[in-house]
Amino acid sequence: MQMVNLTIDGKQIQAPAGSSVLEAARSAGIYIPTLCYHPDLRPEGACRLCMVEASGARTLVASCVYPVSEGMVVKTNTSKVREARKTVLELLLTNHPKDCLCCQKNGDCELQKIAADLGVRKLRFEGGETRARTIDNSNPSLVRDQEKCILCGRCIRVCRDVQGMSVYSFAGRGFNTMVSTAFEHDLLNSACAYCGQCADVCPTGAIVEKDDTDKVWEAINNPEKIVVVQTAPSVRVALGEELGIPAGQVVTGKMVAALRHLGFDKVFDTNFSADLTIMEEGHEFLQRLQNGGVLPMITSCSPGWVNMIELKYPELLPHLSTAKSPQQMFGAVAKTYFAERAGIDPAKIVSVSVMPCTAKKAEAAREEMCASGYRDVDVVITTRELGRMIREAGIDFNALEEAEFDSPLGTGTGAAVIFGTTGGVMEAALRTVAEVVAGKELPKLEYNEVRGMEQTREAVIDVAGVSVKVAVVHTLKSAKMMLERIKAGTADYQFIEVMACPGGCIGGGGQPVPVDASIRQKRREAIFNCDRTSELRKSHENPEIKTLYDTWLGKPLSEKAHSLLHTHYHAQNR
């Protein structure tokens, strides 16, 4: 790699040729404020907050798009630079609501942080026209507030370039410019998968997850209700970030203790139902493979992905596994098997799930998700929402003693916890399918062939003497490319895992912000560490799963299992 030499604020540094001044400065530990820039996205130089002085340039330049050159001298902290940045920021704030104290992004807002960093103490340009307030609260997952939009374009870029959905675009001119959907429809009537990546990258409160914490508090405070909660695999490796703990720390025990302090009657683990999903999905795959079923079979546990295929490729829906997601399987079992064992009227159970994903809110609201006669899951909150509840309750998270999940839905295996990262569902399925086919325990546990962070990975796996070609895909853009290959007949796989979000659930739309590739990698490493240190590492070895089948379901794909744990998907016309 060719390197160039430059000087930033008197510091001699080297940077790769073609990189930006901003990237060079950050690599040297020099802070330059940004709003439109995001490390996961292509830079556009829209906000102008990152302006610097650069030798050879007649005016201040946007460092996020200005390339380094040999011998360049850059100044990031002159009075001219500081005044220009402050002016840009004050102009943005003039057209921005002043409700920071009650905004959902209070404390996580990048605009708020930069205003403090730049020393903005009063606004010199008050009294101008402000953008009309329009709030889109139409769907179960996301809320958009146009008045808080600063036109950074991050949502447009992540939806177009990372997810390939292109739900958002700029519309209008001048002061009337806004981020809009097609024909200015609300998200409920747009081709939105509800993945929440736009909320992850939005620097303000213009796009946020729909806050359902009031529903949870109401249920907890109702003495007539039994409130049970499940926590997804990736929540335990990300929740700490909401509470001042560095990224990549596993906080399972403290999380369980915090949930008890909040008042939940039972604290269960979605890892239990992830193991259950593997039992059902794995046997479904074998049934298709051995009996000439529709192949490739594609996983269906990522609701953002399911929404996308229903919206864009409904003709390929027969490829989807009929197995419900772990969240929905858990809900069905909680209101039947658990209620029966505990002697509780299912009507009194409020089933809450803590998920890394905004699309899970929409999934729980689907008409199909009530096979037991009750909603499988009543309320879904994200990792961010749980963090807010813990802070609201005044819980000192770091001081909590670790606690264990409750039985009988609280035991999970290492195979279940790796659901939280791309390739994890595939690897978990292979661990079980291989031993089912072989009829005996096998020495191989880790399938490194399907690990990695490339957006599309493929491998040929020897499953007890049978060669199975598999693929692993993450991001909706990559998923669309895979579906085009299936349509063209060039995807000669038997089994495909798809996750909607970058990195899988570790990068979900409801996870703590800020997030970038390095943070996702730390969460991913924590997930695999959970697997390596698990006493049980194969789904079919979970004793609570064995008891569930032995005493209640009978066997995988039984009539009762099909009734409660499987579903079918349909085209969405919006």
Predicted regions and their residues:
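Eukaryote-biased recognition of intrinsically disordered, low-complexity regulatory segments
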Residues: 1-11
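A short alpha-helix capping/helix-coil boundary motif
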Residues: 1-3, 134-136, 176-178, 233-237
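Iron-sulfur-associated redox domains of electron-transfer enzymes in respiratory
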Residues: 4-5, 15-85, 93, 209-574
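Short strand-loop junctions, especially beta-strand C-caps/beta-turns
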Residues: 9-11, 182-184, 234
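Charged, low-complexity surface patches
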Residues: 14, 138, 148, 191, ...
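Fe-S ferredoxin-like electron-transfer domains
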Residues: 48-194, 200, 207-222, 226
